[in-house]
Structure formats: C-alpha cells, structure tokens
C-alpha cells in the first residue's frame, strides 16, 4: 500500500471476491432491475415495519455473500470483519443487522457515500493483512429515508421536479486478497460546503464534492480521465450529473461520453414516478453489485472510477437554516488480465 499525493492510496493486493444485490419492486421495474440477484414484491418483505424490511434486505445480501464464498471454498470461510452503513439514525439498520453475526463490526456513515467508504476501509485492512475476508455493505429504503429526512410517509405533500426518489436497495460484497476484480486505488474525499440549504435538492450540494474528489484523484495519481473507461457516480441523478459535468469541464476534464450515474439509471425517469431520478445509499450498492462489476468481469471495461456521493443532511441543522455539506469517496476497479 502506497500513499499517493494528498488523499489517495494505491493498493497492491485487494480484490472483490463475492457480491450480492437486492432491490425493491419499483427498482426491479427499472432498466437494470433484471440484473439484481433478488427483488421484493412490496415495501415490507413480510415484515411489520419498513425498518425491519431494510434490515432483512441487508441481512440477506450478507448471507448470500457468505453462501457464495462457501461454495468456492474447501472449508467454511472465516469472516474477519463487517463494515456496514445506512441512512437511519445511529445507522440503526446496520447495528440491528449485526445482532445476528458474532463478527467484529465497524459502522460507517457518509450518507449515500457510505458503501464506498466501507470498501475503502476494508481495502486498507486487507492490504495490511488484518484478515482474509471482510464484508462491506449498505442499504436504503424509500419509506425509512422519507420518514427520516423529509416528511411522514402519510403527509402527501407536493415535491418539486428536482426532487430525488430514495431507492429501496441493498448490496454487500467481500473484500479479500484474492478475487474476480482488482481494487487498485482509492481517494478519500473532503467535506465540501456549497452553501446549499434545500433538502429537496441534494444532488446540487453533492456535485461539487464529487468533482473535487475526481480532480484530487487525477492529481494525486498523475492520471488522465482518458485512462478510465467509465466514471460511475452514486446518486447525482439527472440534475446533479449535469452540474458535475459542467464543473469538471471547467477544469479541462470531459466525462460526457463516459459518465454513468446509478441514481439516474436505477429508474426509468421518463416513465416511473421518481422525479429527477434515484438517490440513497442503496443506489450505488445495488447497481455496482448487480451490473457494473459484472461488466468488468465480462471484459466490457478494463478500468472504472467509482465515486460515492453523500449529502451530509441533518434535519436539526436544516431547521436552523444551516447549509448542507457533502462528501464523496472514490475507488478504482480493474479487470484481471
């Protein structure tokens, strides 16, 4: 492991070994729904609350990663650590999920960038021989997030066109020193305040943080955007993606022909009632696991930059008219030759 520049790390022996994805009914009806390992038929998944549904989704993603690992191992594999994050207060879904597992646990929170944060931490630990198998995971549920950050689900208030619809999705993967896709570098983001106060327009506050991390990554690694086949962002959706491209172009970085935003793609914006697209920690966890990693394995892409985008929204601070800061973390995945 080598530190590169101010914020980046180059890895020598970190891989994604197994993965699993699960999504909700509306997400399954979207353009990438068929790529998910499993989908729900309703918002409860047999439980009596939305929170319990989200716990069940994240648990199932973890369980199936372990099942897949058992299928390729001669003996029952040991999970050395789990690193999870979600959008609920005190990352409640992650904490309650972990009650089932007698495994060391780190809970993380970078809002919708939590999944990439967990992968970065897991990669650092694997590189430093903390263990052989570390599970990273994240989730979101439309109804838990609406209640958490905006209004009660029964409120029924009107929303602006630039509003984003929280995806119901969960993903987990296993970071190891062997695997199918290599994780070659990462860039840890900084908290950026763009003086944005509208909790309905989170992509606007996330786009500058995303741009900052991309610029820092290219500078730290002395790289060009031409070195990457695809630039994947978490949940900027339609409007935030436009802002990101404009900011980067001002810095001489053109991603117009290679940008893929998970929030913009997880739904069909033109035919589904999702306003300007999707958001939530499950966006990047679901789409990365269900679609992007498989495209690398199949040889469609050689090198991909993936950026988790997190708006650090706090309802109390918003009620005090404080601006909403944001953070973005970045990893690079490469195909094995």
Model-predicted regions and their roles:
Residues 9, 51-58, 62, 111-115, ...:
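Generic structural signal for well-ordered, non-membrane alpha-helical segments
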Residues 49-56, 79-125, 162-165, 171-172, ...:
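Active-site-proximal gating segment of KS-fold condensing enzymes and close homologs
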Residues 87-91, 111-115, 140-144, 233-239, ...:
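Gly/Ser/Thr-rich loops at beta-strand to alpha-helix junctions
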Residues 1-83, 87-94, 100, 209-226, ...:
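Conserved active-site "lid/cap" helical segment
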Residues 27-29, 93-95, 145-151, 242-244, ...:
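Short acidic, glycine/serine/threonine-rich loops at helix termini
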Residues 109-136, 175, 279-300:
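Active-site-proximal alpha-helical scaffold in enzymes
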Residues 84-85, 134-140, 304-309:
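Short beta-strand segments
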């Amino acid at each position: 492991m080598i530190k590169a520049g101010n914020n980046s790390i180059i890895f020598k022996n970190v891989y994604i070994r197994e993965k699993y994805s699960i999504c909700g009914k509306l997400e399954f009806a979207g353009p990438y729904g068929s790529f998910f390992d499993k989908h729900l038929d309703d918002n409860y998944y047999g439980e009596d609350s939305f929170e319990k549904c989200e716990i069940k989704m994240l648990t199932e993603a973890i369980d199936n990663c372990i099942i897949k690992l058992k299928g390729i191992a001669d003996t029952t594999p040991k999970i050395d650590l789990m690193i999870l994050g979600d959008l609920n207060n005190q990352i409640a879904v992650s904490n309650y999920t972990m009650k089932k597992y007698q495994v060391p646990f780190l809970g993380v929170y970078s809002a919708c960038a939590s999944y990439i944060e967990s992968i970065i931490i897991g990669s650092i630990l694997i590189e430093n021989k903390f263990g052989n198998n570390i599970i990273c995971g994240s989730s979101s549920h439309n109804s838990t997030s609406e209640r958490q950050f905006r209004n009660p689900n029964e409120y029924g208030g009107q929303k602006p066109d630039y509003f984003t619809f929280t995806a119901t999705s969960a993903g987990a993967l296993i970071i190891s020193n062997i695997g199918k896709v290599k994780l070659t570098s990462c860039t840890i983001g900084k908290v950026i305040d763009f003086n944005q106060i509208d909790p309905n327009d989170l992509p606007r506050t996330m786009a500058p943080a995303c741009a900052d991390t991309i610029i820092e990554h290219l500078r730290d690694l002395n790289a060009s955007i031409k070195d990457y086949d695809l630039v994947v962002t978490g949940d900027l959706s339609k409007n935030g993606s436009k802002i990101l491209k404009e900011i980067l172009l001002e810095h001489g970085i053109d991603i117009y022909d290679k940008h893929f935003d998970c929030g913009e793609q997880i739904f069909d914006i033109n035919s589904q009632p999702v306003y300007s697209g999707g958001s939530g920690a499950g966006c990047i966890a679901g789409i990365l696991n269900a679609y992007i990693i498989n495209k690398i394995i199949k040889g469609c892409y050689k090198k991909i930059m993936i950026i988790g985008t997190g708006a650090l929204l706090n309802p109390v601070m918003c009620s005090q008219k404080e601006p909403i800061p944001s953070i973005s973390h970045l990893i690079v995945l490469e195909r094995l030759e």
